[in-house]
Each structure stands twice: as structure tokens, then as C-alpha cells.
Amino acid sequence: MNNNNNFNSNFNSNRISSTQPYLSDDARNALFEGKDRKWGNNNNNNYDTLSNQDVFEKQKRDMEEQDKMLDALSGSISRVKDTAITINKTAQEQTDMLDELDVHVDSTSARMRNTTKNLITLTQQSKTTGYCSAICFLLLVLLVIIILASVL
């Protein structure tokens, strides 16, 4: 019991006295703008002055307006869906074209490598062929000189 009294005394320590409310009437009116309820506005309910038939008609109009908004939203969603489908088709077509291009680039790269190897081989052979032809030419000249020397 002593613990409970200690809790109550700590809980009420912000009050001037335990019998006084936290806020004076003036402070409460200033805070809540003169309303007798803690939350919200007293005029929140638009149906207070309407008859049952009027409430029904108002709710029916509200529902019709909401249906129109939902129809417009549905149309917008359908257009977004159609656009997304078109984008998907275009992206798929471009992906296919890129795949085909990749295959062509790979085959062209392989042919370029082969051609480069062939050119390197040809260049090396042409260097050797030049030496062989020079040797043959010099042997021919030597042979001509030997023949001319033997004749004279």
C-alpha cells in the first residue's frame, strides 16, 4: 500500500494540489478554442441537421462521385499498364537485336584475329622471301662473273 501511495504522490507531483485540474478553465478554453471536447471540432458531423432521406441522398452522391473518381483512376491505371506493356515489348525487341549484334561482333572479331594472324605470317614470310631472292640474285651474278672470267 505504501508503494501505491508513493506512485500516486509522484504522479500528482505536477499539480498544485491533487484536487485542482492540470489546466485552468481559461487555459483549457485557449488551448481547445472554447470547445467542450478534448479532440476535434464540434461541427465535424455534417449529418447532424439532415433528415434520414437527406443523409441517404448525400451518401449516394458521395458514392457516385467516388465511383467517377475510381473510373478515372482505373482508366489511368489501364493507360499506365498499356505503356508498360509497350515498353516491355520494345525492350525485348532491343534485347534480341543486341544479342544478334553481339553474335555478329563476336564472329567479326574472330575473323579479324584470323586475318591479323595471316598478315603477321605473310609479313614474316615476305621478309624471308626477300633474303632468298637476294641470295639467288647474288649467286646468279657470281655465276655470270665466273663464266666471263673463264671466257676471257
Curated annotation (Swiss-Prot):
Residues 1-22 are annotated as: Disordered. The chain crosses the membrane at residues 132-152. Its main location: membrane. It is a single-pass membrane protein. One of its GO terms (biological process) is endosome to lysosome transport. The keyword Heme does not apply. Belongs to the syntaxin family. This is Syntaxin-8A. It comes from Dictyostelium discoideum.
